[in-house]
């Protein structure tokens, strides 16, 4: 549980034992080396049944699996023995803060009692604060960045793919330019994600698609999936109310030169966003412990929710593949019927007029099947290019929120309790020194400086803890807007089915009407 108000020490839970078993189910398998073999995601385990279906999908599952592996293993976010995991997260409650520790702003300490605050969670001020944040984020907005693969691969020994990245609107804090296109590599996207994680560790930074799965770095289907994943990544970044204002994001989208060369020459800032910031005391007055309880509940359920949505997305992809097969089989059926009609005349030489009439109607059936194949193809393309993308985008959003929770558990610790105890001990020593004439002045001054330094550190850590709390609340609040993505994707799904079901019905009605004149007897 991500209990932001707990005074208990952070123990090493089973999910955080080591980078190897932080995701126990995310292990490389022999299947990783081939796309045609079954690759399992951390949440869609091999041979996991869903009714009569078995989710051993080799596409989306592999993509999510590799994304999780990159996030938790290759990035090495967790180091064994990390002190933060054993430290009190929010420090001691005010009742345990010694009032004699002058200079410490105890108003920033975690509040044990909420009696002085608004008893109800949704107070007017808090509601206004939340609404102002929610208005800054619209996950249903249209994509404003397009990512296209450049067919020619570069490199002498190791070939790499370049992407044409084009923004369709004028970006914040930039001048309108006739050239809104830049060329970027996968490594450039990776650099952007890394610097965003350094600057905004407690923001919803979307994950990148895997650079490769096994040996699939040149497979056309994999490259198409990766391009779509990169497009989802950059559009989620540019939709975020904070990330879209970042100078490095704007640089990524606007600097026309090679980004690798630019990085070597330029001096750019990657310091954490909280540097030199002070928490607004108005926010502290808005805080309510129930907010952290909501986060804990969301954190406890997020894996289960992610698993369910991935299953849904896998089944949508299967539907897309079935549409492709249906389209091909309808065309094949049309050709087979045409062949039958061409040869049927030899079987009925005595009834040439009748058989020719029948064959002309069979030709109508063949054309009808080709028309249905075209309809199935259009439906498949719409599923692939629009509907499936919306399902995957919601996966990216959930994983981004999960990343916030996980990074909090790893990076948000402090040692306020330890420092407080040390200040209390040193204060007692200082008082005993004052009554002891034999103590040297240098020793007294050194101890006093240590106390002052620890007080400053406590104040800084309390300030950072509140800034983190505010940041995560902002992210959780704007995340609430993504619930409408669920509505949107299912509305689009139903709309698409109605559209193509109507086309199919109309086509069958026309062919049925034409077949009414097909001979049933010699008369």
UniProtKB/Swiss-Prot annotation:
Record GO terms (molecular function): identical protein binding; phosphatidylinositol-3-phosphate binding
Query: Which InterPro entries does this one have?
Result: AH/BAR_dom_sf, PX_dom, PX_dom_sf, SNX8/Mvp1, SNX8/Mvp1_PX, Snx8_BAR_dom
Compartmental location = Cytoplasm; Membrane
Q: Identify the keywords attached in UniProt to this record, alphabetized.
A: Cytoplasm, Membrane, Protein transport, Transport
Q: Does the entry feature the keyword Transferase, yes or no?
A: no
A GO cellular component annotation here is: membrane
Q: Name one GO biological process term.
A: plasma membrane tubulation
Task: Specify the PX domain's residue ranges.
Answer: 141-260
Answer whether the UniProt record assigns the keyword Protein transport to this protein: yes
Q: Where is the composition biased (Polar residues)?
A: 17-37
Spans through the membrane: none
Q: Where does a 1,2-diacyl-sn-glycero-3-phospho-(1D-myo-inositol-3-phosphate) bind?
A: 185, 187, 211, 226
The segments labelled Disordered in the record are 1-37
**Where does this protein chiefly localize?**
cytoplasm
- How does the UniProt record describe the way this protein sits in the membrane? Peripheral membrane protein
The similarity annotation says:
Belongs to the sorting nexin family.
Entry's free-text remark on domains: The PX domain binds phosphatidylinositol 3-phosphate which is necessary for peripheral membrane localization.
Q: What does this protein do?
A: Required for vacuolar protein sorting.
Q: Give the protein name, as stated in the record.
A: Sorting nexin MVP1
Source taxonomy: Eukaryota, Fungi, Dikarya, Ascomycota, Saccharomycotina
């Amino acid at each position: 549980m991500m209990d932001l108000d707990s005074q208990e020490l952070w123990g090493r839970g089973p999910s955080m034992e080591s980078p190897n078993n932080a995701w126990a189910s995310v292990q490389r398998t022999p299947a990783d080396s081939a796309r045609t073999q079954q690759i399992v995601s951390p949440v869609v385990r091999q041979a996991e049944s869903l009714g009569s279906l078995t989710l051993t999908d080799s596409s989306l599952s592999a993509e999510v699996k590799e994304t999780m592996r990159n996030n938790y293993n290759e990035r090495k976010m967790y180091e064994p023995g990390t002190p933060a995991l054993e430290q009190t997260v929010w420090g001691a409650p005010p009742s345990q803060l010694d009032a004699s520790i002058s200079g410490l702003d105890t108003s920033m300490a975690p509040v044990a009692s909420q009696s002085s605050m608004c008893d109800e969670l949704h107070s007017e001020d808090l509601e206004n604060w939340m609404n102002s944040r929610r208005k800054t984020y619209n996950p249903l907005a249209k994509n404003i960045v397009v990512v296209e693969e450049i067919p020619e691969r570069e490199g002498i020994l190791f070939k790499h793919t370049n992407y044409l990245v084009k923004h369709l609107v004028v970006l914040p804090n930039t001048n309108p330019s006739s050239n809104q296109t830049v060329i970027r590599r996968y490594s450039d996207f990776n650099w952007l994600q890394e610097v965003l994680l350094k600057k905004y560790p407690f923001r919803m930074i979307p994950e990148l698609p895997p650079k490769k799965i096994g040996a699939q770095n040149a497979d056309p289907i994999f490259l198409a999936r990766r391009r779509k994943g990169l497009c989802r990544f950059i559009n989620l970044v540019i939709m975020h109310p904070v990330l879209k204002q970042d100078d490095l994001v704007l640089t990524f989208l606007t600097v026309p030169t090679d980004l690798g060369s630019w990085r070597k020459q330029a001096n750019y800032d990657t310091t954490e966003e909280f540097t030199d910031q002070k928490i607004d005391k108005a926010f502290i007055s808005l805080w309510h412990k129930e907010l952290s309880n909501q986060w804990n509940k969301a954190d406890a359920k997020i894996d289960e929710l992610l698993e369910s949505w991935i299953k849904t997305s896998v089944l949508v992809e299967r539907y897309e593949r079935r549409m492709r097969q249906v389209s091909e089989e309808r065309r094949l059926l049309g050709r087979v019927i045409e062949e039958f009609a061409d040869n049927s005349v030899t079987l009925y030489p005595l009834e040439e007029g009748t058989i020719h009439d029948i064959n002309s109607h069979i030709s109508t059936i063949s054309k009808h099947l080709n028309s249905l194949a075209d309809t199935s193809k259009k439906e498949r393309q719409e599923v692939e290019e629009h509907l499936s993308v919306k399902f995957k985008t919601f996966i990216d959003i959930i994983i981004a929120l999960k990343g916030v929770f996980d990074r909090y558990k790893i990076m948000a610790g402090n040692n306020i309790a330890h420092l407080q105890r040390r200040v209390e001990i040193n204060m007692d020593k200082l008082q005993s020194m004052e009554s002891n004439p034999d103590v040297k002045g240098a020793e007294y001054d050194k101890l006093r400086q240590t106390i002052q330094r620890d007080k400053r550190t406590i104040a800084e850590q309390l300030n950072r803890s509140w800034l983190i709390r505010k940041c995560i609340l902002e992210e959780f609040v704007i995340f609430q807007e993504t619930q409408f993505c669920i509505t949107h994707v299912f509305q689009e799904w139903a709309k698409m089915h109605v559209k193509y079901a109507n086309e199919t019905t109309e086509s069958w009605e026309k062919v049925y009407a034409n077949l009414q004149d097909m001979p049933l007897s010699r008369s």
